[in-house]
A protein has these predicted regions:
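Internal, well-ordered alpha-helical scaffold/interface segments
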Residues: 339, 365-368
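Hard-cation-handling environments
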Residues: 313
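Metal-cofactor-binding active-site regions of metalloenzymes
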Residues: 2-33, 37-298, 347-361, 368-457
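Active-site loop ensemble at the mouth of alpha/beta enzyme cores that anchors a bound cofactor
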Residues: 317-329
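C-terminal amphipathic alpha-helical interaction region
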Residues: 302-304
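Short, basic/hydrophobic alpha-helical segments
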Residues: 340-345
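Divalent-cation-assisted or electrostatically stabilized phosphate/pyrophosphate-binding catalytic cores
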Residues: 332-337
Length: 457
């Protein structure tokens, strides 16, 4: 019996369902464009087989292991390495067994839908993973991973991915992107400039990062001008390796518009380590404005992922480091926070700043009205905790009336779990098709327009 319903996410009403199905069929086979995510470029540079099912489904995916941790499974038992270098559980079969036993916890969640889709459509599995069949399915997947058809590049091609963007720190040497480029492989994997480590004074090792920033760029980062020049240098380096965007994961959307002398004084104070929390927020905000001005110069699209309370568990952060499933949504202001930046660049039609939020309460009140007015702003798709059927539906319902469809930017999967990419894009295409079918059947959109919008999204 298939794990996935062919009519999943479509409306119950027959007329709406038939139209949603037709809309979906018109876009289902379009190539996947993945403009923001966290896949490891080493997969495509080396094109070595994925080691085992646990390394593919569990270890890299904090959507998965955070659920298991919430049910009392120790993180180390899931193969996650500690910050001090100690390895977690090394036996992939034990990790897989934890996962199989926990599979019921994913019922009704988007992760459960993505996992079912991956097991069925990538590996041909038609039974629900459980403790009873854990070893049988493990052996089946492991056998498939040993074949050429399941190497990273082959999967990339079978997933019909047109382009995939990874995300690298400003200090990254991009060696794996260089190797991909030199390999002659035709798959398009590009990088994205993520400068958080050298623009956020609260980022661990910030001062050491700034020193390294100066070393790799040859700029005098003791000065404000030299520091900005270092960013321009790295942005150019990233562009050479395919980057089309920068990405900024800030705790808030706060921006600043300081004078040159004010910025110099603040930067000196930041480097001294004798700054306040308000100084750190002001500096992050000034750097968003500086990055926007640089985007006007070099053409990089700017993505702002604001409002995540990073590393909420001190215990997990201390033991295992960042990006371990303990980043939590927080309330986020955009109207007041973005005004300093918008006063500088908001009316620039040749600049694209994509706003993402984890605070759904601001969809209709703040970000849709902003993007529906300022030519520099676009709305990013539902992000992280909200890239689900219900999340996409809420997003469309609360933003379309004010911002329309063409002030949004389509879908991105934002994933570390490679096999979930087709599943996530499938959910997005189905969800948008369902929403469009509702607009048509309630007389708010012509059917011909709905098919055109579906293609454009």
């Amino acid at each position: 019996m298939p794990l996935t319903d062919p009519n999943r996410l479509f409306p119950v009403d027959k007329r709406q369902r038939d139209l949603a199905r037709a809309l979906y069929d018109s876009v289902a086979e379009l190539p996947i464009i993945s403009p923001h995510g966290h896949c490891d470029p080493v997969w495509f540079a080396q094109n070595e087989r994925f080691p085992n099912p646990a390394e593919l489904f569990v270890v890299p995916d904090h959507y998965v292991f955070r659920m298991l941790v919430s049910q009392g499974v120790p993180m180390a038992d899931l193969g996650v390495c500690r910050e001090n270098g100690e390895t977690g559980e090394a036996d992939p079969r034990k990790i897989w067994h934890h996962f199989a036993k926990a599979y019921p916890f994913f019922r009704g969640t988007p992760s459960g839908m993505w996992l079912d889709h991956s097991l069925e459509h990538v590996f041909g599995i038609d039974e629900v993973l459980s403790a009873a069949n854990a070893w049988e399915l493990y052996d089946q997947i492991e056998g498939q991973l040993a074949t050429a058809a399941f190497r990273p590049r082959a999967l990339f091609e079978s997933f019909n991915i047109e382009v995939l963007a990874t995300t690298e720190c400003a200090l990254d040497d991009l060696r794996w992107h260089q190797k991909i480029k030199a390999s002659g492989w035709e798959g398009k994997v590009i990088t994205t400039y993520r400068p958080d480590a050298v623009v956020d004074p609260d980022f661990e090792g910030f001062i050491e990062n700034i020193r390294a920033f100066g070393t790799i760029t040859g700029q005098n980062v003791e000065t404000w001008d030299g520091y900005l020049a270092a960013h321009r240098s790295r942005r150019e380096f990233f562009k050479f390796h395919g980057a089309t965007a920068s990405d900024h994961g800030h705790p808030s959307a706060a921006t600043s518009n300081l004078t040159r002398s004010e910025a110099e004084v603040l930067y000196t104070r930041i480097l001294s380590g004798e700054h306040t929390a308000r100084d750190a927020e002001t500096f992050r905000g000034q750097m968003l404005t500086e990055m926007a001005k640089m985007s006007l110069e070099d053409g990089l699209i700017m993505q702002i992922h604001a409002g995540s309370r990073r590393n909420h568990s001190v215990q997990i952060f201390t033991q295992f480091g960042r990006d371990k499933g303990f980043d939590i949504p927080g309330s986020t202001d955009y109207v007041t926070a973005l005004k300093p930046l918008l006063d500088v660049v908001g009316m620039e039609p040749n600049l694209t700043i994509i706003l993402f939020t984890l605070d759904e309460t601001v969809y209709a009140r703040e970000i849709a009205p902003l993007a529906g007015a300022y030519p520099a702003l676009k709305l990013g798709p539902p992000w992280w905790f909200h890239d689900s059927y219900e999340g996409i539906k809420r997003f469309r319902e609360m933003t379309t009336e004010t911002a329309g469809f063409y002030n949004t930017v389509g879908f991105n999967d934002d994933t570390r779990a490679f096999c979930s990419i087709p599943a996530r894009h499938d959910v997005s295409r189905r969800s948008d098709s369902a929403y469009l079918s509702t607009l048509v059947t309630t007389g708010r959109m012509r059917e011909t327009d709905a098919f055109e919008v579906a293609q454009d999204l």
